[in-house]
Each structure stands twice: as C-alpha cells, then as structure tokens.
Amino acid sequence: MAKTSAVEKNKRRRKLVANHAAKRAVLKAIIMNQSLPIEERFKATLKLAELPRDGSKTRIRNRCEVTGRPRAYYRKLRMSRIALRELGNLGKVPGVVKSSW
C-alpha cells in the first residue's frame, strides 16, 4: 500500500485541476494568440503564474485504485499490475483467465 498522504495529495491535486482547468485554458489561449498585443499576453502569463502549481494537469500521478501504487499502472483498468494479478487470480476481473497452452 502507498502512503495515505501521497494518495490524498493526489486526490487534492485532481480537485484543483478540475477547479482551475477552464481558467488555465483561457489564459493559455490568450498567451498563444499571436494577434494580441504583447502586453496583454504578458499579463495573462503573470495571471497564469499566480494560479496554484498543483492546479496543472501534469502534476497528477496515475495511481492504482486498489493499492495506491504509482508504478506499473494500467490505464484501462485503473490498477497496478500487482493488484490486477491478485484480483485476476481471485476471478474478480471479468475476462481475465490464467494462461495455459
């Protein structure tokens, strides 16, 4: 199991991203718009820098829903390889069977 604090921190970051996503998108569009004057684009850059860092989507870490493990994460299943193996052996993941040939 991952540390509870790491899992909770990631949950907090996900909430911040959801809250600030629209504002970040607007500011980034202003910054990237070449037709606007440079002063206005610079002001948008400063406003973007004032937003919390954890509100950026790149700060989110994919973690296993079962264990909180950050590595060996399968996006489709939202769990790590270890949790997948354990639940697969118990027959709790539909369609997963032990291989034999």
Curated annotation (Swiss-Prot):
Top-level division of the source organism's lineage: Bacteria
Keywords: Ribonucleoprotein, Ribosomal protein, RNA-binding, rRNA-binding
InterPro entries membership: Ribosomal_uS14, Ribosomal_uS14_bac/plastid, Ribosomal_uS14_CS
GO molecular function: rRNA binding; structural constituent of ribosome
PROSITE patterns per UniProt: RIBOSOMAL_S14
HAMAP family, A to Z: Ribosomal_uS14_1 (MF_00537)
NCBIfam families given in the database record: PRK08881.1
Name used for this protein in its record: Small ribosomal subunit protein uS14
Native source species: Rhizobium meliloti (strain 1021)
